[in-house]
Amino acid sequence: MSVPDKFFGRYQLDKSENFDEFLSSKGVNWFVRQMIKLAGLTKIISQNQEAGKYNMENLTSKKNTNYQAWELGKKFEAPGLDGNQHEITFDFKDEILSEHHIRLNEPETSAETYFYTIDDQNQLVMRMENNGIVCRRWFKRVEQK
C-alpha cells in the first residue's frame, strides 16, 4: 500500500463549504473562527527520501506543522496546528488518504479524521465531519512535486 503520485504537490486553500458551521460544532468561539478563516493555508504532500515514507506540511500565517518520514498505518506523535501534542496516523484506502489525530491532552474526546481525495479538477479535497456537519475544503494545486 502506498500513496499514489497524484497526491504529491503543493496546494493552496481555494474555498470551503460549511467550515464555520464545522468549527462552531466543535465549540470554537466566533472570534477564533474568524481568525482561523482569515489565515491562509497551504498543504504540501511529498514522498520522503526513504522508500515507503511521506511528508506533509501545513503552512499558515499563524503556525506551521511539518510531519516528516511518516508511514501509512503507523502512529507518531507531533504538535498539531492547535499547539497541542497529537498522536497522528495516516492511511490510504479506496483512493482516500486519511489523517487521524488524537490530542494527547484529551484522548477521550478529541479524535478527528481528515479525508483527502483528488477531484476531477486535480484539486485536493479535504473532508471533515463533526456532529453530522460535513465540511469540505478545496485546495488548488500550485505546483507538482
From Swiss-Prot:
InterPro entries: Calycin, Fatty_acid-bd, Lbp1-4. Disulfide bonds: none annotated. One of its GO terms (molecular function) is lipid binding. It comes from the Eukaryota. Keywords: Lipid-binding, Transport. Belongs to the calycin superfamily. Fatty-acid binding protein (FABP) family. PANTHER family: FATTY ACID-BINDING PROTEIN HOMOLOG 1-RELATED-RELATED (PTHR22725), FATTY ACID-BINDING PROTEIN HOMOLOG 4 (PTHR22725:SF4). This is Fatty acid-binding protein homolog 4. It comes from Caenorhabditis elegans.
